[in-house]
Structure formats: C-alpha cells, structure tokens
Swiss-Prot record:
<dbReference type="GO" id="GO:0004842">
    <property type="term" value="F:ubiquitin-protein transferase activity"/>
</dbReference>
<dbReference type="GO" id="GO:0070936">
    <property type="term" value="P:protein K48-linked ubiquitination"/>
</dbReference>
<dbReference type="GO" id="GO:0000209">
    <property type="term" value="P:protein polyubiquitination"/>
</dbReference>
<comment type="function">
    <text>Accepts ubiquitin from the E1 complex and catalyzes its covalent attachment to other proteins. In vitro catalyzes 'Lys-48'-linked polyubiquitination. Mediates the selective degradation of short-lived and abnormal proteins. Functions in the E6/E6-AP-induced ubiquitination of p53/TP53. Mediates ubiquitination of PEX5 and auto-ubiquitination of STUB1, TRAF6 and TRIM63/MURF1. Ubiquitinates STUB1-associated HSP90AB1 in vitro. Lacks inherent specificity for any particular lysine residue of ubiquitin. Essential for viral activation of IRF3. Mediates polyubiquitination of CYP3A4.</text>
</comment>
<dbReference type="GO" id="GO:0030514">
    <property type="term" value="P:negative regulation of BMP signaling pathway"/>
</dbReference>
<comment type="pathway">
    <text>Protein modification; protein ubiquitination.</text>
</comment>
<keyword id="KW-0067">ATP-binding</keyword>
<dbReference type="GO" id="GO:1904262">
    <property type="term" value="P:negative regulation of TORC1 signaling"/>
</dbReference>
<protein>
    <recommendedName>
        <fullName>Ubiquitin-conjugating enzyme E2 D1</fullName>
        <ecNumber>2.3.2.23</ecNumber>
        <ecNumber>2.3.2.24</ecNumber>
    </recommendedName>
</protein>
<dbReference type="GO" id="GO:0005654">
    <property type="term" value="C:nucleoplasm"/>
</dbReference>
<dbReference type="Pfam" id="PF00179">
    <property type="entry name" value="UQ_con"/>
</dbReference>
<dbReference type="GO" id="GO:0005737">
    <property type="term" value="C:cytoplasm"/>
</dbReference>
<comment type="subunit">
    <text>Component of a E3 ubiquitin ligase complex containing UBE2D1, SIAH1, CACYBP/SIP, SKP1, APC and TBL1X. Interacts with RNF11.</text>
</comment>
<dbReference type="InterPro" id="IPR000608">
    <property type="entry name" value="UBQ-conjugat_E2_core"/>
</dbReference>
<dbReference type="GO" id="GO:1902916">
    <property type="term" value="P:positive regulation of protein polyubiquitination"/>
</dbReference>
<feature type="active site" description="Glycyl thioester intermediate">
    <location>
        <position position="85"/>
    </location>
</feature>
<keyword id="KW-0808">Transferase</keyword>
Length: 147
C-alpha cells in the first residue's frame, strides 16, 4: 500500500512539481527522499536553497511522513535539529495530503511564520516584537547557510 502510494506521488511530483519545490528518492530507497525548497520570493529567505529529508513510515499515508530541514534556518517554527512545527505533520495529518501539498505548506510557513505555536520561543518573541530584526537575522542565516 505505502509503496504504491509513494510511487504515485513521485510520478505526480515529477509531472507537476509544486512552485519553488522539488523532491525525490535518495538512491533506490523510495521510503527516504530528499526535498528542496527555494526561499520564497519577497521573503527573508529569498535566494536560499533549503534541503529537507523526507522519511515515509511503512503505514504511509495513514501516518504522516517525517520531514526535517537539513539546512540551518532562522525561523520560530523550525528548530536547530530541523524539526518543523506544522499541524499537518502531526495532529492534522490526513491520508488525502501529499508530499507536494506538505512542501507547499512548509513554503507558506516560511512566508508566514506562526509565532503563537513556536518551536523556538526566542525567535518567536523577536518576530512579534521586532519584525525588522527578525528579517535581518533570517536573511543573514539564509546567506550563511543556504547559498
């Protein structure tokens, strides 16, 4: 079941990739993918290339894939281990979702952080109190780690 679904998602992704994103298997292991998100235009991450790992559980799509950034990023919802605080990767997961939709959601999280559900409270506080300082730090990290 999982393998068929993953193969279908892969062919859909290759035929119609989501904006600013790409993904595919690492070697021959269809349960382990690498994904790429280009920093969205008009965001502090513009120009950056961010890599993520995608691990599918054997009971996919009934359980969500484990997705994490391998590129360091300054963001209130993404911690230093690359873990992403995004409801659809946890409690709001649905088998109707696809890797493509999840990558687009991560992209929009880069444009619109959720400081009220932070993984990194310090960054969330800066985002809320001094947006210019937040954007400056995010741009610096993008230039340092994602270019």
């Amino acid at each position: 079941m999982a393998l068929k679904r993953i193969q279908k998602e892969l062919s859909d992704l290759q035929r119609d990739p989501p904006a600013h994103c790409s993904a595919g298997p690492v070697g021959d292991d269809l349960f382990h993918w690498q994904a790429t998100i280009m920093g969205p235009p008009d965001s502090a991450y513009q120009g950056g290339v961010f890599f993520l790992t995608v691990h599918f559980p054997t009971d996919y799509p009934f359980k969500p894939p484990k997705i994490a950034f391998t590129t360091k990023i300054y963001h209130p919802n993404i911690n230093s281990n690359g873990s992403i605080c995004l409801d659809i990767l946890r409690s709001q997961w649905s088998p109707a979702l696809t890797v493509s939709k999840v990558l687009l959601s991560i992209c929009s999280l880069l444009c619109d952080p959720n400081p009220d559900d932070p993984l990194v409270p310090d960054i969330a506080q800066i985002y809320k109190s001094d947006k210019e300082k937040y954007n400056r730090h995010a741009r610096e990290w993008t230039q340092k780690y994602a270019m």
